[in-house]
From Swiss-Prot:
One Pfam family, short name: F-box
Domain of life of the organism encoding this protein: Eukaryota
Stored InterPro entries: F-box-like_dom_sf (IPR036047), F-box_dom (IPR001810), KIB1-4_b-propeller (IPR005174), SCF_F-box_domain (IPR051304)
Transmembrane segments: none
Database matches in SUPFAM superfamilies: F-box domain
KW Transcription (keyword) present: no
Lineage: Eukaryota, Viridiplantae, Streptophyta, Embryophyta, Tracheophyta
Provenance organism: Arabidopsis thaliana
Name of this chain's protein: F-box/kelch-repeat protein At1g64840
Length: 384
């Protein structure tokens, strides 16, 4: 006989709701019976925040067409009982199902989400069968050029602002070789006069400001009101690729990936190293760090995100105090760690390098990133 879950006291439901930390646990609780939904509000992190904005596809011409700015939550998926011995993980976003074949689930006990994994048609998976870990979020532009095949993410940052006693927002966008800005009070795109001579590479918002990296290595801070730009470079500049990774609103990390042997005859990507810094906002400078604690930095596809290793699935192969690039050439990568012994006398120890404990195969990158982890014993051939 099925228990009548609707008879649970409201006081007990309120107590349960206060102890659910995972957004998918909340969704599962809401699926038990309809009367529970008032006690378990739908998680805000799964609600797709979106804004209709003027399209910029024909900039500087003004268009009456609209595009959509969406805030997408990024998750890491792993089957609790994988069929294969080699674990696979999927990194990607979850959005609302707006397809024509959208259907109501046949049972309130079925807590499912529609997923598109590599080399498969979209299908429903029961969330209870997966470990699902939130890794942050990103903003994407959709439908900005209906005639273009590349109508997805182009590089955008969103910043809510308080002005004239009301809630407004500012959007900074990387489009081709331009930086465009839109204020909600005006709803039109304007070109930003850049201080750097190079093209924009990446941009994030953090604590009320925009931070922008350029291809020549410049890093600038943009004030959202005046668009005044301030150079914010490390005290010891490196010829490197620079990546900005916010840790919520608590910290902003800078990862610089560089070749420690630029004069070598052969370019060896496996010997590239990283330097990691954290923003000291009060001092207005980058402070080098050698210990990320339990944090893991994911850099590459689906933006750059930071999470606690304690939230990652057991045996995932990525431990704390590490960096994982998901956009490495050749679809093979390793986590970067500090102080790795390579056995080569010329390799500096006090630096972030490949740790070959776990090899990460990047099986697919769209529509989600598929990662396959292999133990060191399985890839000794790479060290020869």
């Amino acid at each position: 006989m099925m228990p009548n879950w609707s008879q649970l006291p409201e006081e007990l439901l309120n107590l349960i709701s206060k102890n659910l930390d995972n957004c998918f646990d909340v969704v599962h609780a809401r699926s038990i019976c309809r009367s529970w939904r008032s006690a378990f509000p739908f998680p805000s992190s799964l609600s797709t925040l979106s804004y209709s904005l003027p399209t910029f596809a024909k900039f500087p011409l003004v268009s009456k067409d609209l595009c959509t700015l969406k805030k997408i939550q990024i998750f890491l998926f792993r089957a609790r009982n994988p069929a294969a011995d080699i674990p696979e993980y999927f990194l990607g976003g979850i959005d609302q199902d707006q397809s024509n074949d959208h259907m109501e689930l046949p049972s309130p006990l079925q807590c499912s989400v529609k997923v598109k994994f590599p080399q498969s048609d979209p299908f429903l998976v029961n969330m209870l069968d997966y470990q699902i870990i939130p890794l942050g979020f990103q903003y994407i532009m959709i439908g900005w050029d209906p005639e273009s095949l590349a109508n997805g993410y182009v590089g955008v940052a969103f910043l809510p602002v308080k002005k004239n006693g009301g809630d407004e927002f500012v959007v900074l966008l990387r489009y081709r070789n331009h930086l465009l800005v839109l204020r909600s009070s005006e709803m039109r795109w304007m070109k930003v006069k850049k201080t750097s001579i190079a093209s924009c590479k990446g941009l994030v918002s953090f604590r009320g400001r925009f931070y922008v990296t350029f291809l020549n290595g410049d890093i600038y801070v943009f004030d959202p009101y005046s668009l005044e730009q301030t150079l914010l470079m490390p005290s010891e500049p490196l010829r490197s690729s620079k990546y900005l990774i916010p840790n919520g609103s608590d910290e902003l990390f800078l990862v610089e990936k560089f070749n420690p042997f630029p004069e070598a005859d052969v370019l060896d990507l496996s010997r590239f190293a990283c330097r990691v810094s954290r923003l000291d906002e009060e001092a207005g400078q980058w402070v080098e760090v050698i210990d990320l604690g339990d944090r893991v930095l994911f850099i590459g596809h689906f933006g750059n995100v930071c999470c606690s290793a304690k939230e990652l699935p057991d045996g995932c192969g990525v431990s704390g105090n590490s960096i994982l690039f998901t956009n490495e050439p050749g679809y093979v990568t390793f986590a970067y760690k500090y102080g790795v012994h390579t056995g080569r006398a010329e390799d500096e120890l006090n630096i972030w390098r490949f740790s070959r404990e776990i090899r990460v195969m990047i099986v697919n990158t769209f529509p989600v990133v598929a990662l396959r982890l292999e133990r060191q014993a399985e890839n000794l051939a790479l060290d020869t």
